[in-house]
């Protein structure tokens, strides 16, 4: 990896990155939007869409009403500003001072697939190295006998939001920065 050639010492040794495709909405977990409660039921302003087409799921709707989260939010001590979290995460709220919540990610994609590709690789176009590959490249490894990182798939009857291989691949990077898929059933690794 690149870690030995850094011009400064890396602050992180490990990263635990949880991406739950098809999980709860950010609006129901960490992204507190009090204005949505005030605007509940009003139609989505045209300037929010900024001329973008509407997805197929909503194209036949006559209106696009705003709606807040159904869950209560409280502010938790984390830094000078604190972190807002919903009642869905009571146990995480107890350790929020020890984690990093990133609430600034944005994509122009209006559909899940290109948006997920952007979150995982930094580009809406498939084929770029994943976050795991970049972390492997930047941090190096503490053990050459273990994979750079692992990807865990949940066992599900529905695969609408499956984590495609291209979302955790190395793209143009060397294969030693490739993660290993752990299966949820039977043998975790097929060898």
Question: Model-found features: residue ranges?
Answer:
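Ligand-binding pockets and gating/stacking loops
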Residues: 1-191
